[in-house]
């Protein structure tokens, strides 16, 4: 089996995690107590869903997941929520005092007390796997726990499981909406380690997803639950081929191979289509061509940046439901003829396609319509550099005055780490710029890169 372990760090990661496991359980027909009426074989079994769930002798299905937070309130909601019986109590790890939006507390002072316990629990899950494929790490980098403890954990995972892939689903601060004053500091310090210790990072941004909820689902005031359910659909589509059987299945490592041209350039943009409310879906056809086009709409991107300002390096389309390769090829051919969607000249093919026959499931009482076919696109575009340059600019404004820096230094960080992380991001922006430059005829070969 090719198992995957999910790690949810901090409030953002845990709440996205709740939405994901709720959806996975619905997709596989697993009840909130872990029983699965449709699964007749007790014990192991070679079913595809065993990549995400392990099965006990009593026939109970337990998610291969760990939830970590430095303070108890959010995890207590999981402990008392609908799915409290789904998780093993040891999978829910919470500390006593939180990171207070401070990267240094999450990474140095408070995080380091809890990180060994986390790694122990992860080791137990890993020992329970026959062929561990990699980790999915969910966190947000605006706060203290997600950024600090999240990056500490990734660093330690690199040491313990060097060869395993790590995919990050990371919530980045939004351009307009802010939840903490020190977001730019936390996210830049955290990205500094994401650069080195994740293989693929999918960037999500609340503001972009708010706008999608308002525009496509007509929700006037979207809540985090609305956002998280949308993110869960994306993650479900990405992992569908690990959990169900399909025509063109995609492994975690395949993402990496197809999406990452250079190790540092691994920050992905995602979109999902059709995001449509039940009232509208009734009147629309939503052919493969239509959903493919809307996946490329700048307005449907889950991070605030405009792909028209950049070039695509690679792009992975995960279709699910009633989709045949012929339609996919036709609609991708149409996309390639469009002038608005530009690929870099050194990557002529650029498309990776996965097809899974299991249609997407929706949460009962949720906002999304049940549709016959859906697509999730993960693309590597130079436009994502906009997200970094925005953050860098905010970081510079604060750091020029050394505002709030004493909180970090007081927790044992050195000021040099700020400038080191900032320089690393400046280099990253430069990398993105260089990747998008046209290669002149004949000189591209000699330059060796």
Curated annotation (Swiss-Prot):
One of its GO terms (biological process) is microtubule-based process. Keywords: Acetylation, Cytoplasm, Cytoskeleton, GTP-binding, Hydrolase, Magnesium, Metal-binding, Microtubule, Nucleotide-binding. The active site is at 254. Undergoes a tyrosination/detyrosination cycle, the cyclic removal and re-addition of a C-terminal tyrosine residue by the enzymes tubulin tyrosine carboxypeptidase (TTCP) and tubulin tyrosine ligase (TTL), respectively. The keyword Acetylation applies. GO terms for cellular component: cytoplasm; microtubule. GO terms for molecular function: GTP binding; hydrolase activity; metal ion binding; structural constituent of cytoskeleton. The record marks 449 as: Involved in polymerization. Pfam families: Tubulin (PF00091), Tubulin_C (PF03953). The modification N6-acetyllysine is found at residue 40. GTP binds at residues 11, 71, 140, 144-145, 179, 206, 228. The keyword ATP-binding does not apply. It is found in: Cytoplasm, Cytoskeleton. It catalyses: GTP + H2O = GDP + phosphate + H(+). PANTHER family: TUBULIN. Belongs to the tubulin family. This is Tubulin alpha chain. It comes from Tetrahymena pyriformis.
């Amino acid at each position: 089996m090719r198992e995957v372990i999910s790690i949810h760090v901090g409030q953002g990661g845990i709440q996205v995690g709740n939405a994901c496991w709720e959806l996975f359980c619905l997709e596989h027909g697993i009840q909130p107590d872990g029983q699965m009426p449709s699964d007749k074989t007790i014990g192991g079994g070679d079913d595809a869903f065993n990549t995400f769930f392990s099965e006990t002798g009593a026939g109970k299905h337990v998610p291969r997941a760990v939830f970590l937070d430095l303070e108890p309130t959010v995890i207590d909601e999981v402990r008392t929520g609908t799915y409290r019986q789904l998780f093993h109590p040891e999978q829910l790890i919470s500390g006593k005092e939180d990171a207070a939006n401070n990267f240094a507390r999450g990474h140095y002072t408070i995080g380091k007390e809890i990180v060994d316990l986390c790694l122990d629990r992860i080791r137990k899950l890993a020992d329970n796997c026959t062929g561990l494929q990699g980790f999915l790490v969910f966190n947000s980098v605006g706060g203290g726990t997600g950024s600090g403890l999240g990056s500490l954990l990734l660093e330690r995972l690199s040491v313990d499981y060097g060869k395993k892939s790590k995919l990050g689903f990371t919530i980045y601060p939004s351009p307009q909406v802010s939840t903490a004053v020190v977001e730019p500091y936390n996210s830049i310090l955290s990205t500094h380690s994401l650069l080195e210790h994740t293989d693929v990072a999918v960037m999500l941004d609340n503001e972009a997803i708010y706008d999608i909820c308002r525009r496509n689902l007509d929700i006037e005031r979207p809540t985090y639950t609305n956002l998280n359910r949308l993110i869960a659909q994306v993650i479900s589509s990405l992992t569908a081929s690990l959990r169900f059987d399909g025509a063109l299945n995609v492994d975690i490592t395949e993402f990496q191979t197809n999406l990452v041209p250079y190790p540092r350039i691994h920050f992905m943009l995602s979109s999902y289509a059709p995001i449509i409310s039940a009232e509208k879906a009734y009147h629309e056809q939503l052919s493969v061509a239509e959903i493919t086009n809307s996946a490329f709409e700048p307005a449907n991107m889950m991070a605030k940046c405009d792909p028209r300002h950049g070039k695509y390096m690679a792009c992975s389309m995960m279709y699910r439901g009633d989709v045949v390769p012929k339609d996919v090829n036709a609609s991708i051919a149409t996309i390639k003829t469009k002038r608005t969607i530009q690929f870099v000249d050194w990557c002529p093919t650029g498309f990776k396609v996965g097809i899974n026959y299991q249609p997407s499931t929706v949460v009962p009482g949720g906002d999304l319509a049940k549709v016959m076919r859906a697509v999730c696109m993960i693309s590597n575009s130079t436009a994502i550099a906009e997200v970094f340059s925005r953050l860098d600019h905010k970081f510079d404004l604060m750091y020029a005055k050394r505002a709030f820096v004493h909180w970090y230094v007081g927790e044992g960080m050195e000021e040099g780490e700020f400038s080191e992380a900032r320089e690393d991001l400046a280099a990253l922006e430069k990398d993105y710029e260089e990747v998008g430059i046209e290669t002149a005829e004949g000189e591209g070969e000699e330059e060796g890169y």
